[in-house]
Amino acid sequence: MKVFGICASPRNNTTEYVISSALDVLENNGFETEIFTCMGKTIRPCMHCDYCLENKKCIIEDDMQEVYEGLLNADGIILATPVQSGGISSNLSAIMDRTRALEAIDYNILRGKIGMSIAVGGDRTGGQDFAHLKNITYFMIHGIIPVSGGPFGSNLGASFWSNDSLDDIKKDTYGMESLNRTLHEFENFLNKYI
């Protein structure tokens, strides 16, 4: 089974560290993994021009083509975002909007895949829940089954407090516990339903 991870941070720092850690665990457990990082990439926002509705592809030619391929080939999808302005990054918002071109090909094109959310905030309550809710909403709109780590610490997904530092995120044992719980359920769903 294949898991596609999207690191929606414009930097190679805390969010990339967390999603890379998650993908390493999955790879060690026998999953094929692939990561797309937004750092250094160009993902332009959707123009809502409706070109995709008639032509079954997006008119914009940029690094989103790599995301389309990753989403289509994956059994599981992990969305990892830094919390920006209390929600997801602008990179992830553009990716979500541009997925419309896939839906224009087939409304059910992503249906039945398993989805997991990771949110990394500069402080403990910096908007991680709002970022998770946006990711979960995206999953539900596209028929992707959202998975959390369950109650008591990872209700919506894996939440981290980075204190805006790579050194500090490595000390976030609570965040790592939420990641481990969420990964456990993600693997269970992949093994049971895919």
Report residues per predicted region.
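Helix-loop-strand module that forms the ligand-binding subsite of alpha/beta enzymes
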Residues: 59-151
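N-terminal beta1-alpha1 ligand-phosphate binding loop
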Residues: 2-31
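Glycine-rich phosphate/pyrophosphate-binding loop and the adjoining helix
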Residues: 4, 23, 27-29, 66, ...
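Flexible, glycine-rich phosphate/dinucleotide-binding loops
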Residues: 12-13, 42-44, 124
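Cofactor-binding loop segments of dinucleotide-utilizing enzymes, especially the Rossmann-like FAD-
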Residues: 6-10, 38, 120-122
